[in-house]
């Protein structure tokens, strides 16, 4: 297929477009971007007929900051007839064989969501016809490709496929997380989503486990501390402001009424460092770099608040600088990931894992 369809947050189409333009160029897949403000999706139109196929296979979704989900796509199917929308879609998917799942989706906008009831109903007959044509297996198979049909408006859809090992497990790339009734703030969901994004499920028992020591810089009122506590960790919560009383009653939290930028841990046995401070992103990055150089943590998750303009450029500059500084200070083995999570707004979430191949004492 010729195109790559990418889901993103509404208002971040420019950032998603700039990123895919750069990343596709690195893979020598030429093309141009089609994007409109607040559409919540971007289409990268490749010059080569198989450009979308190449990108969906060779470009890791997890390496993209602003894309929630992506799939190799056909040209837009416009003006699908109300009397028979199924046949043109089945025909457009004739090159897809034995897919393991069907997702009929929309972009994440209020206008597109009005189609969600239709999408649910439409899935049933479409699934039956795709099984008959051989594009879809009779039984779902999580190891096979996923068929995507994304309606961007009534009778207008992009169709295509993604590989299950390079795809979000969620419809539209949106995780469905529940806000706990006793969580101190909605920001709690950001860290919950970050753990799911950056730590594979099969590794969570080892890397996100009870008894670990953690530090939360800028913790008040305790949204991120809450996620650490519910996972059984012992938390040093650093903030001049007050902490949630119920969190303090758990006995797992020690509150340090200090400036997060000046705090130094008393003991050097911290596995997780987390930080969600409303501060200039470069300053937060410098703080994390200092902690890494001092050897004060093994893994960190932190948020970078984004400027109003040049957001992709700013994020990449900060991440590139961080990599350079770590290497200059003898930290040559690390994993650095960044994602604009669903529960993020004008910010991105970064994960830094120092020396992943070395066991934690």
From Swiss-Prot:
GO CC terms, sorted: cytoplasm
Superkingdom, taxonomy of origin: Bacteria
Keyword Nucleus: no
Recorded GO MF terms: S-adenosylmethionine-dependent methyltransferase activity
Pfam families found in the cross-reference section: FtsJ, RlmM_FDX, RLMM_N
Subcellular location: Cytoplasm
Reaction catalysis annotation: cytidine(2498) in 23S rRNA + S-adenosyl-L-methionine = 2'-O-methylcytidine(2498) in 23S rRNA + S-adenosyl-L-homocysteine + H(+)
Matching InterPro entries: RlmM_FDX, RlmM_THUMP-like, RNA_MeTrfase_FtsJ_dom, rRNA_MeTrfase_M, SAM-dependent_MTases_sf
Gene Ontology BP annotations: methylation; rRNA processing
UniProt keyword terms in alphabetical order: Cytoplasm, Methyltransferase, rRNA processing, S-adenosyl-L-methionine, Transferase
Active site per UniProt: 305 (proton acceptor)
Keyword Transferase: yes
Enzyme Commission number: 2.1.1.186
Binding of S-adenosyl-L-methionine, residues: 187, 220-223, 239, 259, 276
Enzyme class: transferase
Oligomer and partners: Monomer.
Family: Belongs to the class I-like SAM-binding methyltransferase superfamily. RNA methyltransferase RlmE family. RlmM subfamily.
Role played: Catalyzes the 2'-O-methylation at nucleotide C2498 in 23S rRNA.
Descriptive protein name: Ribosomal RNA large subunit methyltransferase M
């Amino acid at each position: 297929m010729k195109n790559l369809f990418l889901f993103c947050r509404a208002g971040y189409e420019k950032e998603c477009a700039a990123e895919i333009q750069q990343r596709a160029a690195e893979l020598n897949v030429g093309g141009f971007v089609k994007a409109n403000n607040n559409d919540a999706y971007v289409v990268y139109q490749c010059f080569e007929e198989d450009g979308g196929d190449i990108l969906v296979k060779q470009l890791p979704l997890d390496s993209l900051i602003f894309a929630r989900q992506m799939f190799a796509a056909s040209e837009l199917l416009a003006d699908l007839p109300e009397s028979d929308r199924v046949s043109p879609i089945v025909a457009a998917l004739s090159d897809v064989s034995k897919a393991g799942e069907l997702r009929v989706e929309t972009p994440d906008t209020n206008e597109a969501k009005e189609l969600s009831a239709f999408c649910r109903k439409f899935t049933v007959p479409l699934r039956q016809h795709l099984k008959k044509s051989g594009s879809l297996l009779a039984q779902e198979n999580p190891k096979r490709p996923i068929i995507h049909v994304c309606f961007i408006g009534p009778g207008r859809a992009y169709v295509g496929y993604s590989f299950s090992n390079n795809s979000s497990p969620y419809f539209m790339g949106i995780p469905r997380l529940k806000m706990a009734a006793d969580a101190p703030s909605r920001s709690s969901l950001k860290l919950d989503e970050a753990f799911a994004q950056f730590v594979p499920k099969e590794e969570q028992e080892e890397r996100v486990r009870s008894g670990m020591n953690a530090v939360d810089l800028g913790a008040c009122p305790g949204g991120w501390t809450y996620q650490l506590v519910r996972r059984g960790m012992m938390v040093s919560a650093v903030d001049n402001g007050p902490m949630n009383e119920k969190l303090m009653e758990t006995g797992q939290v020690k509150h340090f009424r200090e400036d997060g930028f000046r705090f130094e841990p008393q003991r050097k046995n911290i596995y997780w460092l987390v930080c969600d401070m409303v501060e200039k992103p470069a300053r937060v990055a410098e703080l994390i770099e200092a902690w890494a150089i001092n050897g004060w943590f093994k893994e960190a998750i932190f948020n970078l608040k984004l400027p109003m303009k040049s957001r992709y450029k700013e994020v990449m500059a900060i991440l590139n600088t961080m990599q350079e500084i770590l290497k200059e200070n003898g930290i040559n083995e690390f994993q650095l990931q960044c994602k604009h999570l669903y529960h993020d707004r004008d910010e991105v979430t970064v994960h830094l894992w120092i020396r992943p191949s070395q066991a934690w004492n």
